[in-house]
Amino acid sequence: MTLDLIKIRRDLHQIPEIGLEEFKTQAYLLERIAEMTEGKDFVEQRTWRTGILVFLHGSAPEKTIGWRTDIDGLPIVEETGLDFKSIHEGRMHACGHDIHMTTALGLLDQMLQVQPKNNMLFLFQPAEENEAGGMLMYEDGAFGDWLPDEFYGLHVRPDFKVGDIATNTNTLFAGTCEVLVTFKGKGGHAAFPHEANDALVAASYFITQVQTIVSRNVDPIQGGVVTFGSFHAGTTNNVIAETAEVYGTIRTLTQEMSLLIQKRVRQIAEGVAASFGMEVDIMLKQGGYLPVENNPALAKELMAFFDASPMVNLIDCLPAMTGEDFGYLLSKVPGVMFWLGIDTPYALHHPKMSPNEEALAFAVSEIGKFLKYKAED
């Protein structure tokens, strides 16, 4: 069947939902998938919470090729002014997952036309933005014997043009780790500091000392980011703060570097707390947001394939410090992620982010050729 990609994308754009709450999205996808797979006896389907797995049995399979899309939206008030803007107040597809889903449906439709030689799995994964849905599905055994031998996926990129595909043969996205540190001192009157134990001062020392991690502990060739964007302590001007809470993020291009920085954050927090004679709670939450590390051989193959197409402008790009939970699945299954240009002036997660819909036909056509090649390889 021929899909109306623009209509599908606009339908999905209107119903963004937060991770693991994508009930309308799942229902819409299931309806489209049912229409596409009717009468196809080589197709099986499973659901996992709000996720969907569609498996195409190959005619003479030697491996399973996987394609993954995320399906969740963001808690953002949309400001695009589009006729098909979000009908869910305070929710928006500001990260392009509506484009991702539509592309996946278009690719699935192409692969259904003739039974492929190899098995194929199409994964519609929930909760990329908030709960690392890929990790949750893997740990819960959702894949079973459908786990791919190779996994592929894309992410839209606003500053690249339609026709651009960008990736590299190593790390594409950073791994991320949330950091929440709470210093617990003793409150008191500002006029009697000797009777209190100022948590605000302790947290300030901590913030200053963690600046040495990147400058003195991290290999400058590898790099890393430690940023604290939130600091809360005290209630008014003349009361010494009993507690102080700092909230931040770690970004690294390798998991080894992430573990080193996490270790140093913990050591510094515990050291500062000890020097002030107070308690400290430390929360380090990485979960499934590991670095997105492309398999070098598969990435080289994919890049050579797209480079040979006159329709594709292939870009060998540098890594980005943004996070993506596809990194967890790529830590279990070799594969490749790449950027797809959507040519819009607004960045990802911006309330006015609006992709150029011409990217849809391009993506389905060019990526479809690659998947057909992999299906027969």
UniProtKB/Swiss-Prot annotation:
InterPro entries: AcetylDAP_deacetylase, Amidohydrolase, Bact_exopeptidase_dim_dom, Peptidase_M20, Peptidase_M20_dimer
Reaction(s) catalysed (UniProt annotation): N-acetyl-(2S,6S)-2,6-diaminopimelate + H2O = (2S,6S)-2,6-diaminopimelate + acetate
Listed EC numbers: 3.5.1.47
Gene Ontology molecular function: any one: N-acetyldiaminopimelate deacetylase activity
GO biological process, one term: lysine biosynthetic process via diaminopimelate
One Pfam family recorded for the sequence: Peptidase_M20
Keyword check for Lyase: no
Active-site residues per Swiss-Prot or TrEMBL entry: D70, E129
Pathway: Amino-acid biosynthesis; L-lysine biosynthesis via DAP pathway; LL-2,6-diaminopimelate from (S)-tetrahydrodipicolinate (acetylase route): step 3/3
CDD domains, per the entry: M20_Acy1_YkuR-like
Keywords annotated in UniProt: Amino-acid biosynthesis, Diaminopimelate biosynthesis, Hydrolase, Lysine biosynthesis
Function: Catalyzes the conversion of N-acetyl-diaminopimelate to diaminopimelate and acetate.
Family, as annotated: Belongs to the peptidase M20A family. N-acetyldiaminopimelate deacetylase subfamily.
HAMAP family (UniProt xref): DapEL (MF_01692)
Protein name: N-acetyldiaminopimelate deacetylase
Source organism: Streptococcus thermophilus (strain ATCC BAA-491 / LMD-9)
Lineage: Bacteria, Bacillati, Bacillota, Bacilli, Lactobacillales
